[in-house]
C-alpha cells in the first residue's frame, strides 16, 4: 500500500500508518486486536480489527474506516493491513523487547541491538549464527530465534493470501497447521484445505485452484472431488459408503469432467488406500477409509463384548429384582423383568420401546440391580439435553458421550478422546440413552473406550429419525438379530391417559390420531392457509401459552417444523416469531447474518459441531458447542465484532467469521429436535414436499413433548404423514460387518 494518513484508498476505505505503541487487547485464536499507533504526524490513534501476531514496535499500514465506540470513542476499524519492519534502532529495540520473537527478552534485545544496530533484523533472518556471539545465545537458540522471527512474517503472508477467500480465523488455523510452508503447500495443491482445515469446503478450495490456474481435470482436483462427495454424503445424508457407480456419477456432475477420468482417479484412490472398495449384495461400494475401519471395528468390538459378558445368574437377578420391587413398592411387568434379566445375562443388550412403555422404569431397576452387585455404572447420552433428562429420570449423574470419553485436543488441534483403547473407562456397565442418535464415528470412539468384559446397554426408540451423522447404528444392531433385544410394547395405565402417548403409538402403527379432543395434553387448531398457521403460532408463543401456562419460548415452548422453507418453515417462522418476541429496540444491538438478523436477546442454535470453541461456566473452562445446542444471545459488541451466547450457563464468544454456525431457534426442524424434550411442542401442518410427509418424522416430533402438543394447520397433512411410511435409504454396512461374526 502507498499510504498517507486519512487519504481515501480503494473501495472508499481510508488509509493510516504508524508504529504500534501499545497492544491493548489481542485474541490469539482469531487475531482480533486493539492497539494504539503513533503516526508520522505525531498523533496517537486506536486501531481495532483482525491483525494477528501484531507486536509493539512494529510499523503497520492499514485500510479501514473511522467509527465512534460508545465507550472508547473514535477508533479506526481495520479491514486490511500490512506489517512493516521497524527501521530505527529505537523501534527495533522496542519490537524485540516486546516478546514478539520467542527467545528474546528485554536484556537480549538490548544486547542484539547494541551489537548489530539497524542490521539486527538482517542478522536474525539471514545470518542467525552471528547471534551466538552474544552472551546467553547458543547456536541452537539462535536458530530458534530466527525461526520465530520468520513466523511473524509467514503469518502476514498467509493473511494477505487468504483475505480474498477466508476470514482471519481460518487464516490463523491454516498458519497454525502448516507454519511458514502454508502458502507453498496450498499453491501446490489447494485441495489439501478440504478436510484438514475446519470450515473449508470443496467449493472454496476449488475457487483458489481456479485462481491459481489449476486444470479442471487435474488429478488432485478429481481425487478431492470424489472424497468430498463421500464426506458430504456422510455428513449431510448419513451414508457411510456410496455405490461406486453412484459416487462417480455425482462426482461427474460436481467436477464437469469425463467419466473415464473420474473412474481412473477412483481406482488410484483405492490403490493408495484413501478409499476402500468392498462388495455389498453384489454391488461395489466405496468408503472413506475412516468409515470403513469404524464399521469393521464396531462390529468386531460389539461381538467381543457380547461373548465376554458374564451371565450373573437368573436366580440371583430375580432375587435382586424382588428386593428392588419391595424398596420401590411396585411390581414389574413380565416383559420388564425379562429386560432386566437380559441386561444381566449378556455383554450387549438393547432396550427399545415407545413413550409410556416403561423404559425409564426398567433403566432405574437395571441401575439398582447392578449397583447392588457392586458394579461401577456410567450413564451417558449423545446430547447435553438428553444427558440432562437421563440424569433427572434415572436419579443418577449422566454425561454426554463426549464428556464421558473426556474430549480434548491433540496435535494440530485435532479432536480426540482421552478415553480410548489405550486408556479405557473403568466402569463395568455403560448405559447409553437415546441410542438411536449414535452415529458411526461416535459409536466407534465409545467402543474403543470400553474395557473387555464390561457390559454395554443401549436404550432408545427405533422408530425415531436416524442420527444426523453417518450410519444407522441402533437400527442396524437391532436388525442384525445378533444381540439380546427387548422391545417394550405395553402402554401403562397412567400413560394411557395421555393423548400424546396414545397418538404417538397410533402414528407408529399407521393409525390416524385423535384430533377432536378439546382438553388434555394434545390439541389441534385447524387452519387452511400457511400464513394463518404462522400467525396462530406467533400468537400462541407471544400471548396465549405464556398467559395460560407461564412458559415462554426461552424456558418451555418449542416450535418444531419439518422444513426450513415455506410459510411455515423455520426461516419464515423464526422471522415472524422474532418480530413479536424480540423486536428491534433502541440500545439493543443487532447483526445482519445471511438472510436474517441476530439481535441481543435472541434464541439461537448451534448448527454444526464446533469442538474448539471455548466456553466458561461459573469459572470452569471447557471446549465444544455441538450441533443442536440452544442458547440466548447476551451481548453483541459491534466494535469488537463479537457475539456472546449463553448455552445453559456455558458462555461463549463468536467472532463475526463464525456466525455461519448460528441461526435463530424460535422454530427448529424435527431433525434438530432429536434427543430433546420440551414442556410444550407446537408443530405446523402444511403441504411440505412429499419426502418430508413421513410417519417417523411426525412420530419424532410429537414425542418431543413432555406435557403438551399443539398441532396447527391442515389436518389432512397429518393423515398424509401417517399414511406415508417411506424412509430415506441410508447406505450403511454395519449389518454386513456383523454377519462375519455369526
Feature locations, PLM:
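Conserved helicase motor core of P-loop NTPases
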Residues: 462-623, 741
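Accessory, non-ATPase domains that flank or precede helicase/AAA+ motor cores in DNA-metabolism machines
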Residues: 1-319
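C-terminal accessory regions
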Residues: 627-742
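Conserved pre-motif I regulatory segment
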Residues: 319-347
Amino acid at each position: 500500500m502507498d499510504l498517507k494518513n486519512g487519504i481515501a484508498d480503494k473501495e472508499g476505505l481510508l488509509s493510516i500508518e504508524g508504529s504500534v505503541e501499545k497492544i491493548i487487547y489481542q485474541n490469539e485464536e482469531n487475531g482480533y486486536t486493539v492497539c494504539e499507533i503513533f503516526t508520522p504526524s505525531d498523533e496517537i490513534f486506536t486501531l481495532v480489527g483482525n491483525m494477528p501476531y501484531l507486536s509493539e514496535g512494529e510499523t503497520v499500514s492499514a485500510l479501514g474506516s473511522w467509527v465512534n465506540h460508545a465507550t472508547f470513542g473514535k477508533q479506526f476499524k481495520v479491514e486490511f493491513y500490512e506489517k512493516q519492519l521497524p527501521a530505527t534502532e529505537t523501534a527495533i529495540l522496542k519490537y524485540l523487547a516486546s516478546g514478539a520473537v520467542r527467545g528474546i527478552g528485554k536484556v537480549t534485545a538490548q544486547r542484539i541491538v547494541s551489537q548489530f544496530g539497524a542490521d539486527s533484523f538482517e542478522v536474525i533472518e539471514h545470518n542467525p549464527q552471528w547471534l551466538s556471539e552474544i552472551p546467553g545465545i547458543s547456536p541452537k537458540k539462535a536458530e530458534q530465534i530466527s525461526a520465530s522471527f520468520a513466523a511473524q512474517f509467514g503469518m502476514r503472508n498467509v493473511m494477505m493470501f487468504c483475505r480474498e477467500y477466508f476470514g482471519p480465523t481460518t487464516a490463523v488455523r491454516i498458519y497454525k497447521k502448516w507454519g511458514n510452508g502454508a502458502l507453498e503447500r496450498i499453491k501446490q495443491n489447494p485441495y489439501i484445505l478440504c478436510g484438514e482445515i475446519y470450515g473449508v469446503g470443496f467449493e472454496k478450495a476449488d475457487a483458489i485452484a481456479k485462481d491459481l490456474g489449476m486444470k479442471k481435470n487435474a488429478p488432485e482436483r478429481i481425487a478431492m472431488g470424489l472424497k468430498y462427495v463421500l464426506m458430504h454424503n456422510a455428513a449431510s445424508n448419513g451414508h457411510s459408503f456410496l455405490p461406486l457407480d453412484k459416487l462417480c456419477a455425482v462426482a461427474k456432475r460436481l467436477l464437469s469432467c469425463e467419466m473415464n477420468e473420474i473412474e481412473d482417479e477412483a481406482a488410484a484412490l483405492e490403490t493408495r488406500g484413501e478409499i476402500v472398495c468392498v462388495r455389498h449384495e453384489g454391488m461395489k461400494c466405496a468408503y472413506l477409509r475412516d468409515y470403513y475401519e469404524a464399521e469393521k471395528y464396531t462390529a468386531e468390538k460389539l461381538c467381543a463384548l457380547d461373548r465376554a459378558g458374564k451371565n450373573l445368574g437368573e436366580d440371583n437377578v430375580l432375587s435382586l429384582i424382588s428386593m428392588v420391587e419391595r424398596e420401590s413398592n411396585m411390581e414389574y411387568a413380565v416383559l420388564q423383568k425379562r429386560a432386566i434379566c437380559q441386561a444381566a445375562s449378556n455383554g450387549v443388550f438393547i432396550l427399545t420401546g415407545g413413550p409410556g412403555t416403561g423404559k425409564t422404569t426398567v433403566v432405574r431397576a437395571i441401575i439398582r440391580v447392578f449397583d447392588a452387585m457392586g458394579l461401577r455404572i456410567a450413564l451417558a447420552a449423545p446430547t447435553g439435553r438428553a444427558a440432562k433428562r437421563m440424569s433427572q429420570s434415572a436419579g443418577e449423574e449422566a454425561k454426554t458421550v463426549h464428556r464421558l470419553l473426556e474430549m480434548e485436543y491433540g496435535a494440530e488441534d485435532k479432536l480426540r478422546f482421552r478415553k480410548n483403547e489405550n486408556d479405557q473407562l473403568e466402569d463395568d456397565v455403560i448405559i447409553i440413552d437415546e441410542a438411536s442418535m449414535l452415529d458411526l464415528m461416535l459409536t466407534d470412539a465409545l467402543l474403543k473406550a470400553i474395557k473387555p468384559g464390561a457390559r454395554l446397554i443401549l436404550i432408545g426408540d427405533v422408530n425415531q429419525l436416524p442420527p444426523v451423522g453417518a450410519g444407522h447404528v441402533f437400527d442396524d444392531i437391532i436388525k442384525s438379530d445378533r444381540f439380546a433385544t427387548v422391545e417394550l410394547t405395553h402402554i401403562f395405565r397412567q400413560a394411557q391417559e395421555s393423548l400424546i402417548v396414545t397418538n404417538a403409538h397410533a402414528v407408529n402403527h399407521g393409525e390416524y390420531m385423535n384430533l377432536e379432543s378439546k382438553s388434555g395434553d394434545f390439541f389441534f387448531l385447524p387452519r387452511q392457509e400457511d400464513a394463518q398457521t404462522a400467525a396462530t403460532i406467533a400468537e400462541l408463543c407471544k400471548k396465549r401459552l405464556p398467559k395460560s401456562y407461564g412458559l415462554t419460548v426461552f424456558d418451555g415452548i418449542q416450535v418444531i417444523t419439518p422444513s426450513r422453507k415455506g410459510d411455515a418453515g423455520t426461516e419464515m417462522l423464526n422471522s415472524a416469531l422474532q418480530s413479536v418476541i424480540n423486536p428491534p429496540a433502541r440500545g439493543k444491538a443487532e447483526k445482519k447474518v445471511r438472510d436474517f438478523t441476530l439481535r441481543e436477546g435472541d434464541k439461537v442454535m448451534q448448527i454444526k459441531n464446533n469442538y474448539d470453541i471455548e466456553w466458561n461456566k461459573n469459572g470452569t473452562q471447557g471446549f465444544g458447542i455441538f450441533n443442536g445446542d440452544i442458547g440466548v444471545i447476551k451481548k453483541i459488541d459491534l466494535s469488537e465484532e463479537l457475539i456472546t451466547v449463553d448455552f445453559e450457563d456455558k458462555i461463549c464468544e463468536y467472532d463475526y467469521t463464525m456466525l455461519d454456525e448460528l441461526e435463530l431457534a424460535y422454530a427448529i426442524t424435527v431433525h434438530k429436535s432429536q434427543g430433546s424434550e420440551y414442556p410444550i411442542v407446537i408443530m405446523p401442518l402444511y403441504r411440505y414436499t412429499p419426502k418430508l410427509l413421513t410417519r417417523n418424522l411426525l412420530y419424532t416430533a410429537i414425542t418431543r413433548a413432555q406435557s403438551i402438543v399443539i398441532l396447527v394447520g391442515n389436518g389432512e397433512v397429518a393423515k398424509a404423514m401417517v399414511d406415508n411410511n417411506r424412509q430415506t435409504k441410508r447406505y450403511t454396512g454395519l449389518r454386513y460387518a456383523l454377519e462375519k461374526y455369526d
